[in-house]
A protein has these predicted regions:
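Soluble "head" domains of membrane/secretory-pathway proteins
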Residues: 2-11, 26, 30-36, 41-221
Length: 221
């Protein structure tokens, strides 16, 4: 009984704090959240240590703490960067949308073709170890990274048709990304939201010091 009274008193004395925690949890679950990127699969757009803001109502309004969609608010577009809980990969992933439902997509020696149209790739920079390309996908322009001297089965795939309710996604770091080439199409119900900005960034290779030049940086050109 004494423990129960102590608990009741504790709750009563901290009602404002508990309400704030509940509201913040609901906000992060259903409206917006952030995600620390641990890998380089989206380089150079996103690098290790970036903390990304995610708009969780970009495509659906979901019941907090569930995957139940209450209202469809939009649909992913070509070039969107999405965060999703991949059942196939058994982890949360962040990738760029390349193929929409109904699209016919193929890749030949790193060059993507969608519905018979080959994407424009303009060489921006070349070093001893890599190429950087500016890739144009509808209204989206983004930089992709291609490492040299790497033999990989990720460089090409035959024509595939994206099923209804699914998306084909790739990482911008094309030869260092486990994406639809590995795990297949992404079903819509796995989507958590659209990544929009770098909120904060720390340099893993320099004592985790802040990289202020990346703070509040948009992920889109």
């Amino acid at each position: 009984m004494a423990r129960l009274k102590t608990l009741q008193k504790l709750i009563k004395n901290n009602q404002s704090l508990l309400l704030f925690i509940l509201l913040m949890s609901c906000f992060r679950s259903a409206i917006a959240d952030w995600y620390i990127v641990p890998t380089g699969s989206m380089k150079p757009t996103i690098i290790e240590g970036d903390q990304i803001t995610v708009n969780k109502i970009a495509y659906d309004l979901k019941l907090p703490f569930t995957s139940i969609s209450l209202l469809k608010t939009g649909a992913p577009a070509h070039g969107d960067i999405i965060v999703f809980e991949s059942v196939a990969a058994d982890t949360r992933l962040i990738k760029r949308v390349i193929g929409l439902p109904g699209d016919v997509v193929s890749m030949s020696n790193h060059v993507i073709t969608i519905n018979g149209t080959t994407l424009n790739q303009r060489l921006l920079n070349e070093t001893a170890n890599e190429y950087l390309f500016l890739e144009t996908l509808d209204k989206s322009k983004h930089i992709t990274r291609l490492k040299k001297h790497v033999n990989s089965n990720l460089s090409s795939f035959p024509k595939v048709t994206v099923p209804d309710g699914h998306y084909l996604v790739l990482g911008d770091n094309r030869l260092n990304s486990a994406d639809s080439r590995v795990y297949g199409f992404v079903p819509h119900h796995e989507l958590k939201g659209k990544a929009t900005h770098v909120a904060f960034s720390r340099d893993y290779d320099n004592f985790y010091l802040p990289r202020s030049e990346r703070w509040f940086k948009s992920l889109y050109q």
